[in-house]
Amino acid sequence: MYSPDTTKYLIHLNLQAEGVVEKPDVVGAIFGQTEGLLGEDLDLRDLQRTGRVGRIDVQISSKRGETKGDILISSSLDRAETAILAASLETIDRVGPCVAHVVVEGIEDIRVTKRRKIVDRAKELLLDHFEDGSIDSYELLDEVREAIRVEKIGSLGDEKIPAGPNVMDSDAIIIVEGRADVINLLKYGIKNAVAVEGTNVPAQIVDLADKKTATAFLDGDRGGELILRELLQVADIDYVAFSPRGKSVEDMARKEIIKALRNKVPVEYVRDQFYGDVPGEKRTQDLRPQKPGASEQNSIKKENVENENESTPTSFEPISEPAPPVTLHDHMERVSGHLIARFLSPEFTILNETRADDVEMAIDQMTTEVSGLVIDRVVDQKLLDRLVGKGVEFVAARDFNGIIKRPLSIRLMKIAQ
């Protein structure tokens, strides 16, 4: 018995008969006129009996004394045998009592047709039924590398504080909020981060901050400000860096992390905002990354520090040819004492510089995105309200007076005098 699943080829024949004939006449003519023509191996009846040739499908119609139509025969023979069988059918010259002509119109390779359907269907499945996300070798490598970095996260003390592998050996540490922040910094090769995991700062972090150069790297939201306030009360923090508004440290990309850490500011510039002056304590503006003799320097009077800075200028002080400012701290130093104001871009380039007394007019004329304002004058509530809605993320000023309602979207920093 013939199975349609084994069909390889489909023979298409065209029939024209000079008279009216029926389907049985056509089938009888095919079997009768091909019998014994090709030998026993290619006898059409035997081929049908063994299932190598399918049923003969005849579609004809009679009109005006003529019969026309198509004949379809499926075959599972090889190409040569199928071609011979098709050619033999063209020898049919009569159907019933009528003269007839049979012509092979084509031999269709069913497998090619199936392959074409498979390709078309595969395209549909690929576009519509696969989940989003292609396999990327770089993503696979990043996942493996991140897993290795996660395994490298250590824990300090009995409190199991999450920390990078180089926290104890490094001369400087970066204090972040949680374990996810440490993992993200590890992802980009920063191995000296340690997490406070809440506002209750562990004693071991306090001890590390006393011995090493400590940078607080926190989210720029309310939670980050509360943690910084706690750190300023219990730990010796040297520098402060914040993530961009609306983004946490754990979500920052490598370029954003490097930029934020590069633009960290000494703690003196934010101390008044988050903690206020500590009675009886004077902190120097030593910007060196090392902290030898820090306790002795804290007791030096401001006048002596200024004399020392004049004799041995640090890398931040302008010399004969001042370098262009590259950090927020540089702009603070350049503006201090000059009664000017600078509008800065997100990359800390100068968008506009004007007299400090004319800053209100400059704000009204702003046409480009401004990330921050550094100004050598006292900022009051009225000036601060003008900056709301302008996209300004921070204001560094000589002082702040009469600030009753501080905008959550603007970070305030005091320029150390």
Swiss-Prot record:
Q: Which UniProt keywords apply?
A: DNA replication, DNA-directed RNA polymerase, Magnesium, Metal-binding, Nucleotidyltransferase, Primosome, Transcription, Transferase
Comment on bound cofactor: Binds two Mg(2+) per subunit.
Residues binding Mg(2+) 1 are E177, D219
Limits of the Toprim domain: 171-257
Keyword tRNA-binding: yes or no?
A: no
The highest taxon in the source lineage is Archaea
Cofactor(s) the record lists: Mg(2+)
> Region Disordered: what ranges?
278-325
Q: Which NCBIfam families match?
A: PRK04031.1-1 (NF003108)
Question: What SUPFAM superfamilies does the record point to?
Answer: DNA primase core
General function of this protein: RNA polymerase that catalyzes the synthesis of short RNA molecules used as primers for DNA polymerase during DNA replication.
A single Gene Ontology biological process assigned to it is: DNA replication, synthesis of primer
Extent of Basic and acidic residues compositional bias: 279-289
Q: Which PANTHER family match?
A: DNA PRIMASE
* One GO MF term: metal ion binding
Q: Transferase among the record's keywords?
A: yes
The coding gene here is dnaG
Q: Which Pfam families match?
A: Toprim_4
Query: What name has this protein been given in UniProt?
Result: DNA primase DnaG
Q: Name one GO cellular component term.
A: exosome (RNase complex)
Subunit structure of this chain's protein: Forms a ternary complex with MCM helicase and DNA.
Upper lineage is: Archaea, Methanobacteriati, Methanobacteriota, Stenosarchaea group, Methanomicrobia
Family the entry assigns: Belongs to the archaeal DnaG primase family.
